[in-house]
Every structure is written in C-alpha cells, then in structure tokens.
Amino acid sequence: MPIPIQPHDLVTLMASDIPHAVIDIRPREDFVSAQIFTSTTLPIAELDHRLRLLVPAPVLPMVLVGATEADSRAAAGRAEALGFGDARWLADGFEGWRRAGLPTIDGWSVPGKDFGERLLVQEPVPEIDANELAQLQSSGKPVIVLDSRTPAEFERSCIPDGENVPGGQLPLEITDILARPENADATVVVNCAGRTRSILGAFQLQRMGIPRVRALRNGTMGWLLAGQTLDEGRAGWTPHRTSPQSLAAAETAADALAAQDGVHLIAPQDLQLLQGSADPVYVVDVRMPHEYLAGHIAGALTVPGGQLPFSDDQIAVRAAQIVTVCDGRARGIFAASLWQLMGFPHVRVLDGGIPAWTAAGFELERGGEERPFVGGGVRTREGMRAYLEWEEALGAKYAAR
C-alpha cells in the first residue's frame, strides 16, 4: 500500500545513493513554472502509458508529486495498480514542499541547462558573440558556423552561411569539414538556439583537440537580439557518407576521452544479462533517428547525442545503469562522458555498438516512435531576453565559488 513521504525525508532520499524516481504528475505548464530540481515531469494522463518507460524497475522507491496531497496520493495508488511496489506520495503535495520552505526552480530541461552553464564556468569554453561573428564573416577570414540543432530547427531559421551538423554528429564529421580547402585555418563556431548545445558542442570539439573553436553566445536568439537576420527554409542535415579518416579520428578521440574520464565499456553478452536483472537499466541509443528506426535494441530509448541535455524527461532514475549505444564506440563514448559529467554515476558504452550486438546473435527491433525535439517556444524579443537571462543565471552559483 502506498505510503506518504514528508518533504524533508524526500530531500534526504534525493541526496542519497539509493536508486529512486520523483515523478511530478502536474500539467507540464505547472511543472515549467515551478518544480523540484531533478524531478521528472509525467502528467497524470500519461501515467499508464509512460511510467514503465521512465521507471524500468518496479521495486524502486518512487515518489509521486501532485499539486495537492489528494492528487499525489491518487497517483501513487495508480502506480501501485500498475505494479510498482514502493510507490509513495509527497505529503501535502507540491504545495507542502513549498510551505516547508524548500527550493524550487522554473524552466524546462533544467538539469541539462544547469550543466551547460556549470561547464562554461568550470572549463571554460571560449565564446563569441553575434556582433563578433558577423564582423568575422564580413572580414573574409575563414569561419565555419556549425549549427548543432536538429534538422527541423535549422530548416525553420538559421544563421547565414551556417551548416547543420546535429550535436551528436560533430565528432564524426568535423575532420571531413576541416579537410575542405576553404576551411584551412578556419575559426569553428558552434551555435544552437540559445546556449546549452552551443557550449556542449564546442566543448566536445575542444576535447578532440580542434583549434580555434568558439560557442556562439546566446545562439540564434542572441543573433536576432543583436539586430542580425536569420535565413529561412534552408535544407538541414541529411544522412550522408562520412569518410573512414573522419570516423577513425572520432574513434581515436573517443578512446582517449574514455581513458581520461573513466568511461567503461560493456560487452553485448553482459548487456543482455544486465537487461534481464532486477537492476534499473536504460539502454540509450544516441544515433540519429533514422538509424534508430532502421534497427535498435529492444526497449532502447532514442536520444540523439546532440539532444542529450534535454533527455531528463526520459531518465527518471538518475542512479540507474545507463548504457549508450551507437554504431561503434565514438558517439556512445562522447555521450557517456557528458552524462558522467552531468552527475549520472553509472554510465557505460556498448562496445562495438549495434554491429557487435547483432554479431553476438542478438536481434533488433525496427520502427518505433521518433520523439520530436520540443523547444521552449520563445518567440518575442522580450521572451528571448528573459529566457537568456534565466539561463545565464543558472551559472551564477558556480561563478561565485
């Protein structure tokens, strides 16, 4: 039978090493307005359909958070009926959390964005602002603008002369891009819509040893706010052949990264055993969506590497075993390294990826649901300014240390 948990006891649980999940069942707009940091949004109407995907082990402690105690308790009862044996409800609901004086934060995909701002302070990642980039483009000096967003975002609007390379593809394709004669000695600028994916993309290229890399401060929003214009309707990234030399460079860089960061590999047979255990396990396919649809490990989530910062609505148990999968090692290692830096404690990479899985005699599933990237919907200049100020403020606590 579900039991209540007091707000301060939930704080203790969330700070512990015990695998658990905190599921906020309020409407998403309420979650965006105020939330418990690292909780996972799952509106009550989606509970039956998605709870087992979010919480892969039904024996884990799981706390349901509604606006009120009645909402929380009802959701915990529903979770128990779905087979979750340790469902709890937050006493007095989200309002009780607030009345206890405990912190909340607003926004969507906050943990990933918080990580990006922390990275910017602690590494740091060199930036370039919109006016500096515009001047560099007009100077005639070689500059490459790599847009790390999804193809759909790029096609809606992009920086003039930008090239769409979704973030997870950057390590694979950068060697080919730099090999073009016109790109000799070029400055490489990585952009997104705002800040996070620009920072992470530039950081990963830096770690590969790529020179003259910059993150575009505030992305396309900052570009517009600086009075610049965006192109519309240009073709985004499409599948294409990457040279063996570029793939080899990515694999070499990934292996060095794994050694430096302590990223561990797992063999296909061991992953198959892990999936059959009682431990919470997420298999995360970090390839591009068309690759996932063509064939993936049963039960795998699709999180293309560039969208990793925004995957918090799929990984509800932060202390679970996470295994990244690609078509070899490179993309899996780059993704696993970021997840480790974000604070996920148990991340490994399927050694050899999908080819190794099938070579070991294991089958693939085909098809599935491609999850579209859902941005924050910021459209007005006032909204852009407010959003960027909010995002920058996430890093203030790290700068003060």
Which positions does each model-derived feature cover?
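Rhodanese-like catalytic fold shared by cysteine-dependent sulfurtransferases
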Residues: 1-21, 25-144, 148-282, 286-401
